[in-house]
Every structure is written in C-alpha cells, then in structure tokens.
Amino acid sequence: MSRKRDRSVNVTDGDLFKPMMVLSAPIVASQLLNVGYNLADTFWVGRLGGDAIAALSYAWAVVFLMISVGGGLTVAGTVLIAQHKGAGNYRRASHVAGQTLTFVTIVALAFAAVGYVLTPLLMDLIGAEPGSDAFAYAVGYTRIMFVGIAFMFWFFIFDALSRGWGDTRTPLYLMGISVALNVVIDPFLILGFQENPLFAWLGATGLESSLYAATGFGGFGVEGAAIATIFSRGVAAVIGLTLLFTGRVGLEPTLGDLRLELDSVRRIVDIGGPTATEQGFRGFGITVLTAVIALAGTEAVAAYGISTRLSSLLFMPALGLARGTETVVGQNLGANQVDRARRAVKLSSIVVASVFAVVVAAAYPFAETIAGVFIEVGTENADQVIEYAAAFIVIAGPSYVFLGVFQILLGGLRGSGSTREAMVLAIQELWVWRIPISLVGILWLGLGVYSVWYAIAISYVASALVTAAWFLRGTWTENVVDEGEEATTPTASD
C-alpha cells in the first residue's frame, strides 16, 4: 500500500527519547489548544456573571460523562493500530480504523438521543436548582452539545487513529484550525453586538452600536458557547475524515471496512470497553462531585468551574504526553521490544514531573490574579469566587506533579492493552480518594469547597504511588495482538 504522505514517527528503532518527544509534542500542543475551548468559553461566559459560570460547571459534568465514554472506546483504535503497525500488519490497521469509526459513531448517536431527552433531569440530579438562571443556562448548553456530539466524536476518532499510526502532527493542525474558529466566534455568539467588551478593547465602540442597530443581535448567552464549540469541532472533524479516507495520514480504510464485523467489534469492546467504563465512572464521578460541591453554594460551584479550567492547563498536557507514551509502548510491544517500551514510560515520567514542578512554582505567587481572569470583578459574589479559586492553586497545585506521573503510568498500561488494570487504577483516584474526602469535609468538617482542594491533592499523591507500585510488578508487558491470527484475517478489500 502507498504511504507517500505518511507523517508517522518511527519510535521502534534507534534513539528513543528524541522521536518520542517529536511524537508527543504535537499531542501536548493539541491538548493545550483543546484547553483553549474551555478557557475561551469560561472567559466570555464569565462576562455574564456567576450564574452563567456555575451553569458551565453543571453542564460540563454531564458533557464530560458523554464524551468520556466515546473517547474511551477510541483508545481501542489507538492500541490496535499501534500494535498492528509495530507488527507490520498495515492492512489490518486500516480495517480497525474503519470499524472503530462506525462503532463509535453508533454509540454517539445513541448518546445524543437519550441525553437530549434526559438533560433537565440530569441537571436536577447534579444539584442545579430548577427554575434558576443557572439551571436554564445549563439545560440549553447541554442540549446543544448533545445535538452536535457526532461531530465531537468524529474528531476524537480521527485523533485516536492517527495517533496510533504515529502521525500526531495532522491532528494538531486540525485542532489549531478548530480552536482559532472557536476563539473568533465565541464573543459574538455569546454576547452579540450589545455591550460586548471586545469592541471597546479593539477601539471600535461605534462599530458595536452600528452592528447592533442593524441586526438587533444580542448573542445567545451561554448557549452561544456550545454552538461555537460544536461548529468549530465539526469543521475539524469533516476535514479529518476526508484526510483519513483519501489515505493522506498513512491509514487507508475502504468503504468495506465500515461494515461492522462481529470479531472486530468484540476486539474493540474488549480493549476499549474498560477504558470507556473507566471514563464513564470518571465522568459520573465528576457529576457526583459537582453535586457534592453544590451543597456548599453557587459560589463554590463557580469556583470549581474555574479550577477545572485551570487544572486542564496541566491535566491536558499530561494526558497528551501519556497518549504519546501509549503509542510508543504499543508499537514497541507489537515489535516485541519490551525493554524499550518500559524505558519510554520512565523517560516520560521524568519529563512530566520536571516540567510540572517548574510551572506550579511559577504560578504560586499569582494565584489570585490568575483566578480573577475568569470572572468579571464587581459582578455578584465575584470576590468570594476568586478567593475560593485562588485557594485551589495554593492547596492542590503541588500535587499536579504526581498527577503527571500518574497519567504517564496509565498511558503505558493502556498502550500495552492492559486497559482493565488501567481502569481500576484510574477509578480509585476519584472514587476511593477524592469523592469520599470531599464529602466528609463538606458535610461533617464544615470546610466547604476547601475540602475538595485538599481531596484533590491527596488523591493525586496516593494514586500515583499505588499505580507506580502496580507498574513495577511488570505484568503489563504482554502484547495483546495475536500476530499470526491478525495478519491473516481477511478484510473486505482482500
């Protein structure tokens, strides 16, 4: 098969550190750009006040659950394609790409239908008070996200498949296009042409008045953030799938590969199911945690929303490096190079711990200033929200060094196909540590949202230590691909 445009990185031969960083750097950059969606939404929605920020927190708990399950299933595509490529089974890798696309799309459509209907009930269960502005905002935002879920999933699929092949640059370029679109249209879709501070910042106040007089468009409010996200994700998804089926990323799936085969679905579910379950439990856990924080008041929920955006600045890069490690481990185990796979995990752990230590130390003196960026000073309860969010940086910040190592170790396990072990270890962070400690602190110790910040710190440290102990046992190094069986399995194009 022709792969003239193949941009994949060779991580199975020669030096390891440099190609691994070359592979991982675009993923990290892509994850940082991904944070751009949340930061832009939070920044502009923050101009609408505390209820609007709280609505994003309520909505995100459900949205995160939705995309976590689909995202978990795409891990199977990453693992199988990485290991098939390492073993030299290129045709089979392309077949897996088609099967993953069809299966995850079906899951997305099912989620969209069910989620749209159940959104009001879910918001009520999380703790949003029916009849309140925050409840109305959250319902509108979440329903729009459900309507456009397929576009989000398609981009996640393209990203996962390209990553497994070893091409991380193409998804980065598409993410850049998507985020740029989102950043440009966010302020207009959220605030419209009336009382939009963007015009004042650009020195074009007169233009604002003229546009509003001509159109009468005052923005969609919180719902505008959802519309901007779905549109920008959709553009990237369509371009990505076009590149995939024209063979421009190395993989060459055919239309025949889109017809689901029972054996392929079983393999996807077997490998991706535990990660989807893990992400589902995590998403549900975030939902439960949001409901617990709601007991401390709207200001606490708003501060949690800001802390979530701030933490994503570190969590997403850690996840990006972990996904790069996932590919390196998968391809090297596919090539039966166990020691090289193990060394990749150790090198990534050192890199992430070192970088995070520097970033956290730099952020410490500016905690309150950083928190204040995400809410308009002078709006209702803004000072309280900023105080809570700044405390998050001070209390939980140092633990993110451990979070980084924790994510790398999980990435190594997933790359080997040990997704069940990764599932258990990932779930324990939230359900064994963070949620119980938060609940005790809020209900019995009276610490309010501060108990959540302490719970986050304890959970990251404890989980990193537990996962490191498991990793050192070395039982994760067996290759999940049966080379003889998979290399000879017929496909629609054979």
Task: For each feature predicted by the language model, list its residue ranges.
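Alpha-helical transmembrane segments of multi-pass membrane transporters/permeases
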Residues: 161-212, 223-226, 339, 343-352, ...
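Transmembrane helix-bundle signature of multi-pass secondary active exporters and lipid flippases
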Residues: 27-79, 145-152, 266-331, 355-359, ...
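Helix-loop interface residues and adjacent transmembrane-helix termini in multi-pass membrane transporters
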Residues: 36, 47-50, 84-87, 164-165, ...
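Short alpha-helical transmembrane segments in multi-pass integral membrane proteins
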Residues: 1-22, 81-148, 197-272, 329-398, ...
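Generic alpha-helical transmembrane segments of integral inner-membrane proteins
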Residues: 24, 28, 32, 36, ...
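Helix-capping/transition residues at the boundaries of transmembrane alpha-helices
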Residues: 45-46, 82, 163, 171, ...
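Cytoplasmic helix-loop-helix junction between adjacent transmembrane helices
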Residues: 127-131, 135, 145, 149-176
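Small-residue-rich hydrophobic transmembrane alpha-helices
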Residues: 53-116, 152-171, 303-365, 403-422
